[in-house]
Swiss-Prot record:
<feature type="binding site">
    <location>
        <position position="99"/>
    </location>
    <ligand>
        <name>Zn(2+)</name>
    </ligand>
</feature>
<feature type="short sequence motif" description="'HIGH' region">
    <location>
        <begin position="10"/>
        <end position="20"/>
    </location>
</feature>
<dbReference type="GO" id="GO:0005829">
    <property type="term" value="C:cytosol"/>
</dbReference>
<dbReference type="InterPro" id="IPR014729">
    <property type="entry name" value="Rossmann-like_a/b/a_fold"/>
</dbReference>
<keyword id="KW-0479">Metal-binding</keyword>
<comment type="function">
    <text>Catalyzes the attachment of glutamate to tRNA(Glu) in a two-step reaction: glutamate is first activated by ATP to form Glu-AMP and then transferred to the acceptor end of tRNA(Glu).</text>
</comment>
<keyword id="KW-0862">Zinc</keyword>
<dbReference type="InterPro" id="IPR033910">
    <property type="entry name" value="GluRS_core"/>
</dbReference>
<dbReference type="InterPro" id="IPR008925">
    <property type="entry name" value="aa_tRNA-synth_I_cd-bd_sf"/>
</dbReference>
<dbReference type="InterPro" id="IPR049940">
    <property type="entry name" value="GluQ/Sye"/>
</dbReference>
<feature type="compositionally biased region" description="Basic and acidic residues">
    <location>
        <begin position="112"/>
        <end position="130"/>
    </location>
</feature>
<dbReference type="InterPro" id="IPR004527">
    <property type="entry name" value="Glu-tRNA-ligase_bac/mito"/>
</dbReference>
<dbReference type="GO" id="GO:0008270">
    <property type="term" value="F:zinc ion binding"/>
</dbReference>
<feature type="binding site">
    <location>
        <position position="101"/>
    </location>
    <ligand>
        <name>Zn(2+)</name>
    </ligand>
</feature>
<dbReference type="Pfam" id="PF19269">
    <property type="entry name" value="Anticodon_2"/>
</dbReference>
<keyword id="KW-0030">Aminoacyl-tRNA synthetase</keyword>
<keyword id="KW-0067">ATP-binding</keyword>
Amino acid sequence: MTMIRTRFAPSPTGYLHIGGARTALYSWLHTRRHGGRFVLRIEDTDRERSTPEAVNAILEGMAWLGLDYDEGPFYQTERYDRYRQHLQTLLDAGQAYYCYCTKDRLERLRTEQQARKEKPRYDGRCRDLDGPPSEEVADEPVIRFRTPLEGHVVVEDAIRGKVQFLNSELDDLVIARGDGSPTYNFTVVVDDLEMGVTDVIRGDDHLNNTPRQIHLYQALGFEPPRFAHVPMILGEDGKRLSKRHGSVSVLQYRDEGYLPEALLNYLVRLGWSHGDQEVFGVDELIQLFDINEVNHSASTFNPSKLQWLNQQHIMRAEPNHIARHLGPFLAERGVDPAEGPALEAVVRTQQERAKTLVEMADNSLFFYRRPEAYEEKAARKNFKEGTAEILEHCQHCFSGLPSWDAESIHGVVTEAAEAFDVKMGKVAQPLRVAVSGSAVSPPIDATLELLGREETVARVGQAAEWVRQNVG
């Protein structure tokens, strides 16, 4: 069996967005499952809109997602000689011809066809000419492909099944502009055949290009690759996903605290499923994903579901993995994890509740930095008359503990509740506010164990003093 070769071919006119990332993921999974090769090609022929910054953003996004490629990146702007050679091959074989029609003539033709409620298409005026016509001659002729006038093209699509196109519905495609630069439909065919691509997986907005490209493959003497056109992604309003729905850069999801494996998990489920299973690891996806099982219907992007999946992956991941991703978020907040509790230990206390790494970073700050103030609502609810005495009692007991561990700390909290004849919460909550500045933290015994005896005693004493000055 021929080795499977797929490609991801983004245009560097913007960031790597959700739709592009899903296409790349489907191609990558299909390749990895079958032990093939994944090729990265940058389609940068639009010189006005293509930027180095966009290329870097695409490469960075793929690296963050872990979508490694085996060959490339190849750049179309470095391949013009190859395109010119294949253009000449088609011209020499009579499969392509020069079209001298002016823009004005083509616009008049379009207007007349629309007035007759006909599909706008080239009328073949220059198709059988040996040279320029006698009038209305363009300064720079384009090159058109000589599309068969009769018959049909069948696209055997892995997702949509058999799709048939009548040749009579296809006009003679422009494959090179007046300045000699090749057009998209031509370059993509040349690239795919020269790079040995066997399976083209792309968005279904390219389906209508496929019969034209199949003609080009055949004219150049090559078998077309297999095709799979994945359905579009919709916003929750049923319209095509765009920036207004949150169709943002993949890297923005990174910056908002999503794990790459969570985003991959969500993207693969936008069109594919495996029974009722919701949460998948990347290795598991490589084993299970089948491009033939992708649904042909459009999928709806649901930010809440993505966040839920992110929480699931945070809960299930190894603490050292989370710590590697969490470190940069703490650094952004001016925190050096080396100057406090072990980051993996902090992660363990947060994994059950954090929805994003941003949330986890914000909730972890107090482990490395004393609170500058107490949240007003938390202080009002938990710092009451008599709280100072409870805090001072705990402070004294903490100082004298023979060992500093969660069990011993829990014993102090229990003993204090009994000594002051209050419920456990009347001790634990003031302690929580005292050390974290808020009423929300991991279990108090685990929290204090991580903070350490010296820091705990200092913060509890500081809070007791604050209560005496502000509450009484």
